[in-house]
Amino acid sequence: SAASDVYKRQELGRVFPGYFTKSYWLPIFGCTAPDSTEKQIDFALKKLENYSADKRIFMYINFSAIHYPNCHYVKGKTKDDKESHAAALRYIDSQLPRLFEVFQKRADTLVIALSDHGTCYGEDGYEYHCISHETVYTVPYKHFILTKQ
């Protein structure tokens, strides 16, 4: 897609995937697809089937649902705002148990959840994330162990 072509021309898009053995991108994973997280997790679960449970793996998933546009997660919304942002997060959260359940069947798993940036929704008159603002560079972080069941 045009968006992924632009991304690949940027330094991060050219270099970052090279740090991984495998890198996958499909348009159905994009931020404009309302079911992108479901599709990303479906894809990840299918890939996990190729590895025995005792095989250690590193998996990085950049959930695109939180990126704009996210207004489609609230019926009738036409502009992103804190409500649609929260709805996108709830959608992502609703999909994670499927992934976590599979990892718990494999082995103890370290999960690191974080964002690459925040998003302004009117703070100090700013919108979105292509600016230097505390809201943009203050990001959530959590890590935890999923224990094998």
Can you say where each PLM-predicted feature lies in the sequence?
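Catalytic domains that recognize anionic headgroups
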Residues: 1-149
